């Protein structure tokens, strides 16, 4: 009830787990079940965890070493102001060119069985890479036009770390699937997958259960940390310090 109250849009279906990687794997299964397709796209230098599926969506050499990627996992370049691939005449990032590349990549490098995108709102292990403000709104629009789903891995960026419950709120974007962790349990092993209302039944088809996920103690810890964030105005505090740091 608390999550449905504070999360944006129609994110109203929830399943609880005990690690970020497990939540990511569950989110990937939701994408497949909801879309009835299998391929997924992430970005170079993303990090989503260290189990087989999550590793296949990542680009960290130490995590991938000695492991074979799951077929159907693709990576594309991410807008990066430090090393942009495409820019406008004024030197700003040409987001439209990135989106056009994604469209061309899907057409020529996949088997046309793409479920959607799985991305970090702000890249963590890849170097704290912040996207241009128009990137996720345009990617959301592209996904809607092409019938693709958008999953935001907010394990690192969510739960107040950027001054919002979800980092995606900064751009007014509601993902179809969101993974939440780390600050969610404030050190306690509590994570969550949140999905938009049309996809809640996908939890049933993927047997979305976990031996320890959602146990009463973990849920109590997550609820308590959430209430502290609210009561002590920690969202506003993080946003204020973030603005100062970016200066």
Predicted region positions:
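Conserved N-terminal phosphate-binding loop of PLP-dependent enzymes in the Aspartate aminotransferase
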Residues: 1-247
């Amino acid at each position: 009830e608390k999550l449905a109250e504070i999360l944006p849009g129609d994110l109203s279906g929830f399943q609880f787990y005990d690690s970020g990687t497990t939540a990511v794997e569950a989110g990937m299964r939701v994408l497949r079940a909801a879309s009835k397709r299998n391929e997924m796209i992430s970005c170079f230098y993303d990090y989503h965890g260290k189990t087989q599926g999550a590793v296949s969506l990542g680009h960290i050499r130490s995590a991938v070493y000695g492991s074979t990627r799951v077929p159907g996992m693709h990576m594309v370049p991410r807008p990066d102001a430090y090393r942009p691939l495409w820019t406008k005449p004024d030197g700003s990032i040409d987001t439209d060119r990135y989106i056009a590349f994604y469209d061309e990549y899907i057409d020529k490098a996949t088997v046309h069985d793409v479920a959607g995108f799985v991305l970090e709102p702000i890249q963590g292990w890849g170097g704290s890479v912040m996207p241009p403000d128009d990137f996720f709104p345009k990617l959301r629009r592209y996904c809607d036009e092409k019938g693709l789903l958008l999953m935001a891995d907010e394990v690192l960026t969510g739960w107040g770390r950027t001054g919002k419950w979800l980092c995606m709120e900064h751009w007014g974007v509601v993902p179809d699937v969101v993974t939440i962790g780390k600050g969610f349990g404030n050190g306690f092993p509590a994570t969550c997958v949140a999905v938009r209302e049309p996809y809640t039944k996908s939890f049933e088809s993927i047997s979305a259960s976990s031996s320890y996920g959602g146990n009463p103690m973990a849920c109590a810890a997550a609820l308590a940390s959430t209430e502290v964030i609210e009561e002590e105005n920690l969202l506003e505090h993080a946003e204020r310090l973030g603005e100062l740091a970016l200066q």
